Amino acid sequence: MKKMLIILTIAMSVLPAMAGRPKIGLALGGGGAKGAAEVGVLKVLEEAGIHVDYIAGSSIGSIVGGLYAAGYSASELETMFRTQEWLSLLTDRKASLNNEPFKTIDGVTYVFGFPVIDRNSRGFGVMSGGRIEQVIDSMVSVKGCTDFESLKIPFRCVTTDIRTANEVILSKGVLCKALRASMAIPGIFKPVEHNGRLLVDGGMLNNLPVDVCRQMGADIVIAVDLQQSEQQPRKKSDINAISGIADLFGLGGILEWITNRPDISKYYENRKQADIYIHPDLPDADASSFGNKNAARMILAGTAAARKLLPDLRALISNTSQSVSAPM
């Protein structure tokens, strides 16, 4: 009886604080290897004792966000970025062919183990992304979170339906497949089939999903933007990488996408709507800057950018807490 009273007393003391605390959402943008900077932001939030209630991610942001939602700490994610052989994972490199200058297997040509994309072939990409999907599945299985429903933190994964050019937000089902879809760059990776849809990189339409966090119920949204220039949601040179989608969109659809660039207008709107906008300084990094040294440098950049805005975040949490707990 005495033990029960102690538990009830503790619960009653904690509930008012929880009720008055604003819900914090974290919007993690895409940017390939630059996603390591997002790990630096998570490290600062953990050190400051700031709990994240909702996460939305696009492309590499979905990988970081999904694994964090599954229970991986920032320190564990740092180890992953610094030690994982990302190039082999992402390119489906066959280690058994490392010493083979040219080898064709099942219609795919490999150069020293790396699959080569035939620029004249029609299709969406030669790389299946199977290896990265397997690794993610193994990682989330260790934490007991193979699907969205079992995650420790509510999470949304942003993808693009390549047939309709519509944004698709995944919130249930198999986690590893959703994460694979969100980082499937058209023309490089094969799309993921999901409930009758063909899904690819969410960054094509929403590379900074602040709006998704807001829809989840966040009072405060922290956005981590990995873009490094004012007009960079998708560089002009990246258009070559999406040429494969012409098979389903049609040439007219591709030209319309390139002309209207719906991702840019949404990107700037989401930037404006973010309560805390974190923009790590990564001038010499690009989406392929994997490796231990690069990861370490980008994690530090994310840490520095987050620490700079930590006082603003604390003040916002304090002010919002007073607003949330104030009597009606």
Segments predicted by a language model, with ranges:
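Sec-dependent N-terminal signal peptides
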Residues: 4-15
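Patatin-like phospholipase
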Residues: 18-58, 66-328
